[in-house]
Design a protein with these regions (language model features):
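Bacterial N-terminal signal peptides that target proteins for export
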Residues: 1-8
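Conserved beta-strand hairpin/beta-sheet module of binuclear metal-dependent hydrolase folds
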Residues: 23-72, 179-194, 212
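Divalent metal-coordination and catalytic microenvironments
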Residues: 29, 48, 60, 69, ...
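Active-site neighborhood of phospho(di)ester-bond hydrolases with catalytic His/Asp-centered motifs
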Residues: 58-62, 79-90, 112-114, 192-195, ...
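Active-site metal-binding motif and surrounding structural segment of the metallo-beta-lactamase
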Residues: 63-112, 209, 213
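Cap/insert and terminal regions of metallo-dependent hydrolase folds
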Residues: 190, 198-303
């Protein structure tokens, strides 16, 4: 009888463990847009979707991101957070339709980013207030009512907050305007999205031991540009950071990004924000592998990433 009771207890405990696991799925990361400001029929502009269970977080929404979200089957009315790395057009051009979808939902949601985010969002609301009221009126709701469920937040380096069970932290990174990198942690999984940046201090520490580092592909060698681009990349190695009395570069190069990944002990280095043209992966990898020995991914639109438990490189 005692043996039977022990068996029942073990089976019940195993069942509860499985239920808990089912209720706490891993982070899923999808590159919604892997392109740059250039029009590219194969890549839309910047966007990354982080999901965990029913939680949806969109980081950046350049031109074409709304269309790719639809292709991916995302219900924009259930978006929990819309985050900007910075306010360049290739990172925020699709905000209006994505924001409208979130407003037409019924849950609370957050819009956050660096300085000017509040003005950007409020200008959008003021411009489209009659249209938004009309759309919401079809379900007997008003814009004022829905705005009670919206939080707009301007972020600075070192801010920490939660979106449901996902922990979010921020780091200011050097670019041509104020820019923020994000880190998402859930259980033992972590994803870092840098947005656009030039070389600067603190990124490796911020990204330490992350499963996936999604980073600016500045300086990537492209077949279309051939030897000229390759020589430019090699010449600029280690020189793209901000230096006293010298011009601030908009983007780091692949030696610098791969060094960050190595210093941070990253599991997977994921490149995005590609310019128009064909990537010379072989030539680029020769530079990257001098610093970083882990897995390297050249992302494409709608690519799903496995940013789960870390494996030994």
């Amino acid at each position: 009888m005692d043996e039977l009771k022990r068996s029942v207890i073990i089976i019940a405990a195993f069942g509860l463990t499985n239920i808990a696991y089912a209720q706490s799925p891993q982070i899923n990361t999808t590159i919604i847009g892997s392109g740059s400001p250039d029009y590219n029929p194969e890549r839309v502009s910047a966007g990354v979707l982080i999901t965990q269970g029913g939680t949806q977080i969109l980081v950046d929404m350049g031109d074409g991101v709304k269309r790719n979200l639809e292709k991916h089957g995302v219900d924009g009315r259930k978006m929990n957070a819309i985050l900007f790395t910075h306010h360049h057009l290739d990172h925020n051009a699709d905000f209006s339709p994505i924001f409208t979808s979130a407003l037409l939902g019924r849950g609370d949601f957050l819009v956050a980013g660096p300085k000017q985010t509040k003005d950007f969002v409020n200008n959008n609301i003021n411009l489209y207030d009659q249209d938004l009221d009309y759309r919401l009126g079809k379900t007997q709701r008003s814009l004022d009512e829905r705005l009670d469920h919206l939080t707009i937040r301007e972020l600075k380096s070192g801010d920490r907050f939660n979106v449901d069970e996902i922990k979010v932290s921020t780091l200011s990174v050097p670019h041509t305007i104020e820019s923020i990198a994000y880190r998402f942690d859930y259980s033992d999984q972590s994803v870092v999205i840098t947005g656009d940046l030039s070389a600067g201090p603190g990124v490796a520490k911020f990204a330490k031991d992350a499963n996936c580092l999604i980073i600016d592909s500045g300086g990537m060698i492209m077949n279309k540009r051939g030897k000229k681009q390759r020589n430019k990349t090699l010449k600029s190695e280690g020189k793209n950071g901000a230096q006293k009395g010298k011009k601030q570069h908009a983007h780091l190069n692949i030696k610098e990004s791969s060094q960050i990944a190595a210093d941070a002990n990253i599991n997977k280095l994921v490149y995005t924000h590609f310019v128009l043209g064909e990537i010379d992966k072989s030539a680029s990898m020769k530079i990257i592998e001098q610093q970083y020995k882990g897995e390297v991914i050249f992302s494409d639109d709608l690519m799903s990433l496995n940013c789960g438990n870390k494996t030994t490189n």
